[in-house]
Curated annotation (Swiss-Prot):
Keywords: Cell cycle, Cell division, Cell inner membrane, Cell membrane, Cell shape, Cell wall biogenesis/degradation, Glycosyltransferase, Membrane, Peptidoglycan synthesis, Transferase. Cell wall formation. Catalyzes the transfer of a GlcNAc subunit on undecaprenyl-pyrophosphoryl-MurNAc-pentapeptide (lipid intermediate I) to form undecaprenyl-pyrophosphoryl-MurNAc-(pentapeptide)GlcNAc (lipid intermediate II). GO terms for cellular component: plasma membrane. It is a peripheral membrane protein. It comes from Bacteroides fragilis (strain ATCC 25285 / DSM 2151 / CCUG 4856 / JCM 11019 / LMG 10263 / NCTC 9343 / Onslow / VPI 2553 / EN-2). This is UDP-N-acetylglucosamine--N-acetylmuramyl-(pentapeptide) pyrophosphoryl-undecaprenol N-acetylglucosamine transferase.
Length: 380
């Protein structure tokens, strides 16, 4: 440990609240930040605040941290009348967040996005607790724009974010990723064999996020016979839990497809990335950060069902630098598989995509953010 870290390790125990979640794209960075804080300050006490019934309530304890849930829910943009109940839950969540902050007495509160970060960071700011928000996307969400008014630091992953936030608060950190992806780099052959596939064939990895992606799954279901006929290419397909039964039934009905591996959730993502010559994915900010750090050629199919269409903006930030291929969700059923097969057959294109996306990587993001958290605590 260097002198700077020794200095940061001294003094009273550091107490930090980290709030947010909802999807793996928020949870994995949050845990990475917590781990980095503990590396720098082993004495740190870290409490997570999430949303009741959401994925973080299981994943955070699995990572070794305590979490408390708020009764918060997202706004229903299609059925506005349903938001009366949502507003009541928001009031209850703010009251509960206030009590959590009073009891835990954090020196800093960190928001990583997701339902719980709004009420938690709003109450922290009102109670005089320094706050730091992490904006993962290239287009800032409404909640973070509101929280930015009282935030001391705003950690971002894209250029040009001063159009959303005060420039003097912004720090370019990139998005934290799962540390094991960088620490564990299995050999390609070993990784492919772990999925029961052939190391001599090109491999396409299909991701839809931890919950799944309807369009990507339906496109692959419609293309099962094309997949079977394309014997020189193989596929690792993560369906997400919601769509797994539908996909497995379709695959079973299609008959044996030896060049296809299907699972609801890939636990060993380091192996999946090592196996992949090309990735098909939604355009979540966390996933994009992983592709950049691992230099993975990717076809992005942004979800249309997200606030402010931020995934399309994330994708275009890469496409404009020739660092990814973009297929619209509405065009995926006709275009996605043909574009993927054309791309994986073009070694020059794969190399160009890999080289260009590597230039966008921002390593050590979690450590940079952790150091900002510690600085805020020392100033409070």
């Amino acid at each position: 440990m260097n002198k700077e870290n020794n200095k940061e390790g001294q003094g009273d125990a550091l107490r930090v609240i980290i709030s947010g979640g909802g999807t793996g794209g928020h949870i994995f960075p949050a845990v990475s930040i917590a781990n980095a804080i503990k590396e720098l300050r082993p004495d740190a006490q870290i409490l997570f605040v999430g949303a009741e019934g959401r994925m973080e309530m299981q994943r955070v304890p699995d990572a070794g941290y305590q979490i408390i849930g708020l009764p918060v829910a997202g706004f229903d943009r299609k059925h506005l009348w349903k938001n009366v109940a949502v507003l009541l839950k928001l009031v209850r969540s703010q009251w509960k967040a206030r009590n959590i902050i009073r009891q835990f007495r954090p020196q800093v509160a960190v928001g990583v996005g997701g339902y719980a970060s709004g009420p938690t960071l709003k109450m922290a700011g009102m109670m005089g607790v320094p706050t730091l928000i992490q904006e993962q996307n290239s287009y800032a969400g409404v909640t973070n724009k509101l929280l930015a008014q009282k935030a001391r630091r705003i950690c971002v992953a894209y250029d040009g974010m001063e159009k959303f936030f005060p420039a003097n608060k912004i720090i370019m950190t990139g998005n934290p990723v799962r540390q094991n992806l960088l620490a564990e780099k299995p050999e390609r052959e070993q990784a492919i064999r772990s999925f029961g596939l052939n190391p001599e064939k090109k491999t396409i990895l299909i991701l839809g996020g931890s919950l799944g992606a309807r369009t990507i799954n339906n496109t692959l279901i419609a293309g099962l016979q094309l997949i079977r006929r394309t014997t020189d290419v193989q596929f690792i397909w993560q369906t997400g839990k919601i769509y797994h039964q539908q996909v497995t039934e379709a695959v079973k009905a299609a008959g044996e497809i030896p060049n296809l591996f299907v699972t609801d959730f890939i636990k060993d993502m380091a192996a999946a990335y090592a196996a992949a010559d090309l990735v098909i994915s939604r355009a979540g900010a966390g996933s994009i950060s992983e592709f950049c750090l691992l230099n993975k050629p990717v076809i992005l199919v942004p979800s249309p069902n997200v606030a402010e269409d931020h995934q399309t903006k994330n994708a275009l930030a890469l496409v404009n630098k020739q660092a990814a291929i973009y297929v619209k969700d509405a065009e995926a059923e006709n275009k996605l598989l043909p574009v993927a097969l054309e791309t994986i057959a073009n070694a020059e294109k794969l190399s160009e995509l890999s080289e260009n996306i590597a230039h966008l990587a921002l390593p050590d993001s979690a450590v940079v953010i952790a150091k900002e958290v510690i600085k805020l605590a020392q100033q409070s």
